[in-house]
Design a protein with these regions (language model features):
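Active-site beta-loop-alpha junctions enriched in small/polar residues
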Residues: 11, 79, 144, 196, ...
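Short glycine-rich His-centered loop
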Residues: 2-21
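Active-site-proximal helix/loop segments of hydrolytic enzymes
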Residues: 2-4, 22-180
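Periplasmic OmpA-like peptidoglycan-binding domain that tethers envelope proteins to the cell wall
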Residues: 18-25, 196-199
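Short, Lys/Arg-enriched, disordered terminal segments
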Residues: 1-2, 224
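Generic anion/oxyanion-binding catalytic loop in active/binding sites
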Residues: 17, 54, 190-191
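Short acidic, gly/pro-rich beta-turn/loop elements at beta-sheet edges
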Residues: 16, 101, 148-149, 201-203
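Solvent-exposed beta-strand motifs enriched in subsets of small alpha/beta binding domains
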Residues: 177-224
Length: 224
């Protein structure tokens, strides 16, 4: 079991990049929480630098990592340049030849497989990479000022989250297991027993179900 600190970039009075009202801080928080959820469901320990839209300074982020310790620090961001001028995913590390580079390559490949243009793994002097004691990566999940990247981010959100989690688990020699048997608390499965043109037949079937302990309801549908 590994310990991951998941860092959702920006937040609070720092929205990060903004494009057409869309805030980087919101996108990455939602993604960070889902990645952490997947890792926890796969037996990993997860801490977050933030779990809501609040301000967390760079020094607070690195201090949190150094105080709590972890096997890997994963910072999630979205990129920006000029509207529609650049697109793709890139993952940053502080130096080559490290376990952070191994993790970065795994995660970056997973996101390329989702459909992002590959902007490769890059060495960068970012604070959260430089000032953290343990292996750290910073993922730029597409450009927030590129409409095709935003479309991919929205339509493939779960695939993106699973890709990041899968890359993290592969670094630990494990495979991601995702259960499709349960949904969130606001979603339910509905069992449909049959459709009838005659109302009396529908009621007979409803009574049969009730007689063996299955409550049911009658719904009238109209073909459009």
């Amino acid at each position: 079991m590994a310990k991951f600190i998941i860092d959702a970039g920006h937040g609070g009075n720092d929205p990060g990049a903004i494009y057409n009202g869309r805030k980087e801080s919101n996108d990455v928080l939602r993604l960070a929480l889902r990645v952490g959820e997947l890792l926890k469901k796969n037996g990993q320990t997860v801490l977050y630098t933030r779990e809501s839209d609040k301000s967390v300074s760079l020094s607070e982020r690195s201090s949190f990592e150094n105080k709590n310790g972890c096997d890997y620090f994963v910072s999630i961001h979205r990129n920006a340049y000029q509207p529609e001028a650049a697109k793709g995913v890139e993952t940053h590390i502080y130096s080559n030849g490290s376990s952070a580079e191994q993790l970065a390559n795994k995660v970056n490949l997973e996101l390329v497989n989702v459909g992002f243009v590959d902007r490769k793994v890059k060495v960068s002097n970012f604070h959260v990479l430089r000032e953290t004691k343990n292996p750290a990566v910073l993922i730029e999940v597409g450009f927030i000022d590129n409409s095709s990247d935003n479309k991919l981010f929205d339509s493939k959100f779960e695939d993106i989250a699973q890709g990041i989690a899968r890359g993290c688990l592969k670094q630990e020699g494990k495979e991601l297991v995702v259960s499709n048997n349960t949904l969130d608390d606001d979603t339910y499965f509905r069992v449909i027993c049959g459709s009838y043109k005659d109302r009396s037949n529908a009621i007979k079937q409803q009574n049969k179900l009730r007689s063996v302990g299955f409550e049911s309801f009658l719904e009238v549908l109209h073909n459009s």
